[in-house]
UniProtKB/Swiss-Prot annotation:
Pfam families assigned: Methyltransf_2
Gene: phnC
Protein name stated in the entry: O-methyltransferase phnC
InterPro entries: COMT-like, O_MeTrfase_dom, SAM-dependent_MTases_sf, WH-like_DNA-bd_sf, WH_DNA-bd_sf
Origin: domain of life: Eukaryota
Disruption of the gene: reported phenotype: Leads to decreased, but does not abolish, production of herqueinone.
Functional summary from the UniProt entry: O-methyltransferase; part of the gene cluster that mediates the biosynthesis of phenalenones such as herqueinone, compounds that have been reported to treat tumors, bacterial infections and/or mycoses, and rheumatic diseases. The non-reducing polyketide synthase phnA synthesizes the heptaketide backbone and cyclizes it into the angular, hemiketal-containing naphtho-gamma-pyrone prephenalenone. The product template (PT) domain of phnA catalyzes only the C4-C9 aldol condensation, which is unprecedented among known PT domains.
Amino acid sequence: MDQNTLIKTAQQILDTTTELSKHLAESDIAIPNDLNVGTTSGLWTTHNAEIEALRLKITGLSQNLGMLLEGPHGFLHEYVSVNWEHGALYTLLDHNVLEQIPLDGSKIAIADLATRVGLPADKLLRICRLVATVGIIREDTEGEFSHTAISETLVKDQGYKSFIGFQTFETRVASAHLADSLRKPNPYWNEGQAAFELAWGMPMYDWHREHPEKGKRFAQAMQSVSKNLDAGNDMIIQWVKGSEGLQNGKPLHVVEIQGKTGAFSAELATLYPNAEFEVQDTSADLISRGKQTLDPELASRVKFSQRDLFAVRKCDEVSDFTDNTVVFLLRGVLWNHSDEEVITLLRSFLPAMEHGIKPIVLISDLVSPIWATFESHVERAFRRRDVTLTTMHNVKQRTSTEWSQLLQSADPNFKVCAFPVDLFGIFEN
């Protein structure tokens, strides 16, 4: 007789977990036994292909088992009800409640906690209890709360706290307006309107300028995401490490397009002391801030200039670098521009690329995978990003085919070389 699906799925979870534990032991990675304050594990931060694949498989199987156990009504009820947990968590973040809980793992009574943050104790108790039920904080003794490793992260990593705050405030409100944004013809790009704009009355970047406190939080959030969740920067670093120019001893001259304050170029300059960088941006304010915050030791190799994004790049812009490998770096620049704008921008490099030194245009941007590239529990993060870009900016995350078509439309002589990467580790959003 065939084994029932519940037992089969549970056995797959056990078998895969056993295999994962073996890999962790072979890699000398400690297995987390709990989520107490101070707990760390390489399991949470190691993203090699084998470990990540096993971890994701266990997660997917666990989700499947949960759906089988809950059934349609139970699953849907739980799926939508987490909205209330998100609202409760945002309240704790916005009122800095977690910062008032002792980081040494000891408890604090709700009355004391409420006094410290200036909130009514009876309301705060209910909010904390809901957050505790999902394991973010603990209530091991009635009315007394303590940290877990999860809430500890939200206190110690303010950038990540900003990311969670952004996700549980601006994006929640915007996503509630996605349906309304589609009640009339609403094409992508500049001709249409993002759900965020419908919800908040203006485009996201404008809204953050109008609300500088939220704008600062958003900037911190994006910096944290770039550092911790987005593999794009690491992919660029790996490309630079393996670049022909670097291997042959020919110094790199990297022009970072729309490089903002130059934080990433400064990071690259630290890693590669023989390379030099020019950070370009349309914003005089960002360029000024970049100059002010740059490490003085890097000042001779990291330069700044204000420049129009779409201005044509002539041969004389690279003629002084005949002994260098010149790279124009477009890091997350193209995703929010229409096809016409992307083509215009790519064509602006053509005169410079005709120079004998053969400059390179290095593009790191978002790609929407084709259907069924991954298992659904992995694909979910990519589809979430598809909808995120639609909701927040009314832009489309392009497929690899669409990117290739754009490059060919810009100039059929563009030779595209894709950098092979391990996709595991880029699924979080």
